[in-house]
UniProtKB/Swiss-Prot annotation:
Belongs to the NadD family. The gene is nadD. It comes from Streptococcus pyogenes serotype M18 (strain MGAS8232). This is Probable nicotinate-nucleotide adenylyltransferase. Coiled coil: none annotated. PANTHER family: NICOTINATE-NUCLEOTIDE ADENYLYLTRANSFERASE-RELATED, PHOSPHOPANTETHEINE ADENYLYLTRANSFERASE. Keywords: ATP-binding, NAD, Nucleotide-binding, Nucleotidyltransferase, Pyridine nucleotide biosynthesis, Transferase. It catalyses: nicotinate beta-D-ribonucleotide + ATP + H(+) = deamido-NAD(+) + diphosphate. Pfam families: CTP_transf_like. Its EC number is 2.7.7.18.
Length: 210
């Protein structure tokens, strides 16, 4: 994996590297997915297409390594909603290793596990431009960048910089958040068109976020 490459990084270069190595190129989009929404799906799909990845894995976290722990629903509901959201969607799948491992979901531990399980795969870890600024604070970041290629998602013309190797992908801003959807539901408003209909139907059926 070419960790020395910085922005700009073209799809053509990535495709050439892929052809030469014959290794699988897999993206990872981690998150709480509480619930999953359309912006998550657009990011995963567009990164897959723009970088020519074989697949993008949506990876629900167990406990995020944040000081302010997030309030979240049971993992079985988050997983069911993920399954519904990507049903019949090409190129997207689910990775559950962090849920199975339990405890705090450190990306370093996850990538050690995945690279040992799948030594023929190059992993691309997708994060927002705002998270790029926090890379120096990530757990064992200097070792982590040797295991995974970071992909930063930014708005067109948005300028972000980092000393760490990051591939940049431009995407239009979609101002959708899980907290917004939860707030809509709590207030009795239907978050139509913000998340897949089958996910909204599941939320209604299970009485979530009331």
């Amino acid at each position: 994996m070419a960790l020395e490459l910085l922005t700009p990084f073209t799809k053509v270069e990535l495709e050439e590297e892929k052809k030469e190595s014959n290794r699988k190129q897999i993206g990872i989009l981690g998150g709480n997915f509480n619930p999953i929404h359309n912006a998550h799906l657009v990011v995963a799909d567009q990164v897959r297409q723009q970088l020519g990845l074989d697949q993008v894995l949506l990876m629900p976290e167990c406990k995020p390594p944040h000081v302010d722990a997030k309030e979240t629903i049971d993992e079985k509901h988050r997983l069911c909603m993920l399954e519904l959201a990507i049903e019949d969607v090409e190129g997207l799948a689910i990775e559950t290793c962090e849920l199975e491992r339990q405890g705090i979901s450190y990306t370093y531990d996850t990538m050690i596990y995945l690279t040992e399980q799948h030594p023929d795969v190059d992993y691309y870890f997708i994060i927002g431009a705002d998270m790029v600024d926090y890379l120096p604070k990530w757990h064992r970041i200097d070792e982590l960048v040797k295991l995974v290629q970071f992909v930063g998602v930014q708005r067109p013309k948005y300028k972000a910089g980092t000393s760490y190797p990051v591939i940049w992908v431009d995407l239009p801003l979609m101002d959708i958040s899980s907290s917004m959807i939860r707030d809509f539901i709590k207030k009795g408003r239907q978050p139509n068109y913000l998340l897949p209909k089958q996910v909204l139907d599941y939320i209604t059926q299970e009485g979530l976020y009331q």
